[in-house]
Amino acid sequence: MSATRDPLAGAADPSTRTGDPGLHRLAAGALLISFRGTTAPDWVLRGLEDGLGGVCLFGFNVADGEQVAALSARLHEAGRPVVSLDEEGGDVTRLAYHTGSAYPGNAALGAVDDVALTERVYHAMAADLVRCGVNLDMGPVADVNTADDNPIIGTRSFGSSPELVARHTVAAVRGLQSAGIAACVKHFPGHGATHQDSHLEIPLVDASLDLLRERELVPFRAAIEAGAKSIMSAHVAVPSLTGTLPATLSRETLTRLLRRELGYDGVVITDALDMHAISRSVGLAEGAVMALAAGADLLCLGPLPTPEDVRGMVDHIVDAVAEGRLTAERLEEAAARVERLRDWFGATRAEVAEGDVIGLDAARRAVSLTGSAGPLVDPFVVEIDTPPTIAVGEVPWGVAPWLPQAEIVRVKPEEADAGALLGRARDRSLIVVVKDAHRHPDSRELISELLAARPDAVVVEMGLPIWRPGAGAYIATYGAARANARAAVELLTA
């Protein structure tokens, strides 16, 4: 099959599988597909005309805001799609994928702990999304980050207190939805206590149901009460709830807990099914069927599935109905929820002009300085390279844009020569920039070597400030967004 062939071609053909074109349309309507490039391929446009649920955009779909607006307009011409992306502020951004976000992320907002500020920041982000034609934001993150070494949440979380996370999640939901952008609160029932990345494997949340209710579920309960339009499922296993299944595939999680116990009747969206927790356990197509049967309404496929994969998933869903493993009524229920969401889109839209200003204000309020930096003398900056997570991608970070007068080198900690770096920094101000040093032993070792010779050096931590070495000055930004970096440099140069 050609890579550009319509993945739904044949869906209206009575000879195709069940012979029910309406059923094929229902199956297609449950999919949020993705594609490469900055313009929509023909197969996507034809698919939207034939009932595909919508699209999820990634960094590779973005050149600038004007281009995204044009892309979204073309998608909306083809149908009534959900047009979504991950815009969390901080490290995870799609609109600012090539520059870094003008807004700090949740950890910075949680550190400030001003819910009015959080609402204003999310409202400003929502205005950006409105201008770009997006109608659903895959955010906010409502995970309570209780595992210091969590490889995938970290600064994406408001913090480790359920109550703090809950009140800021509510503020974020209000900020987004007051501008007409549907919030998608994630990752249910909670990804904050994990030590693994669900992009790579099935993480484990080893918590009793009572602990879940006291900790992980507190922000989700608050978000539901605040009217969150959608909630994203997590590919995490909670033995007390899901057994060995990821929550995305668990009826106990999505139907019994979320729908019945918590009383949620909004749209349930899966995390990307191409993540290894699903694709390398039950597979994409079977994962789609199991997620729908569990209670999901929209299936985010992620960036990897091809047009052929999409066609195969539609066929597999239709086959599952024919085999009695999934009911047409379940698909109709999902479609009705998504249709209600579409009817809500744009009902309330408000323009704001704060943008970068509110983002920088929030970053300035979050950044903290311990010790004294002193005047900078011919600064030499060592940025310690940190491998990006899949959720973040190759978003630029660091202080370089804001310190044009400095000599800046970026090094891999396992390859760096501390002696050579110290030689270059002789008689100069030494600034060491790192992200999440607490999770990277090689980074900590290099910093310790540098500080042993230069205890007057400044350390700028652009992740979570958990490991605090004895430095002349220690700056914590609570995130690596462009706004966080600027706020840190302002402290250094004040």
Residue ranges, per PLM feature:
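Preference for extracellular/luminal or secreted protein segments
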Residues: 1-50, 280-494
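Active-site mouth loops of central-metabolism enzymes
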Residues: 28-40, 106-120, 201-214, 274-282
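A short aromatic-anchored loop/beta-hairpin motif
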Residues: 33-37, 51-65, 75
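Short glycine-enriched loops at secondary-structure junctions
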Residues: 36-39, 85-93, 97, 135-145, ...
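Catalytic domains of carbohydrate-active enzymes, especially glycoside hydrolases
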Residues: 46-58, 124-126, 131-136
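Second-shell residues forming the walls of enzyme active-site clefts
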Residues: 60-77, 81-83, 91-95, 160-325
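A charged helix-plus-loop insertion that forms the helical arch/lid used to bind
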Residues: 99-113, 157-159
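Alpha-helical scaffold segments that flank or form the walls of functional sites
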Residues: 113-134, 216, 287-293
